[in-house]
Amino acid sequence: MKYQWKDNKKFAFTIVDDTDGASVETIQPVYDCLYKNGIITTKTVWMKPPRDYFPGDSMEHAAYRDYVLQLQRQGFEIAFHDIGSGV
């Protein structure tokens, strides 16, 4: 069975962002650049705050959640990383 890529493309390339260490301050410049250049990726998120040594915001943090939802509206795929780091 041969897979037919969209628009008869020869291959697909994907980028998935690991959410460890993510905050609006650390990811916004990256996602602004990606969006400006037409590169749409997958952003992973934690639902709960980390409970170990990994820093980063979760969907319980209002500003982060709002930004992630903005990314989704821009076409970025939002994926469940885990309930939270160390949970």
Regions found by a protein language model. Give the residues of each.
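Catalytic alpha-helical scaffold of carbohydrate-active enzymes acting on polysaccharides/glycoconjugates
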Residues: 1-87
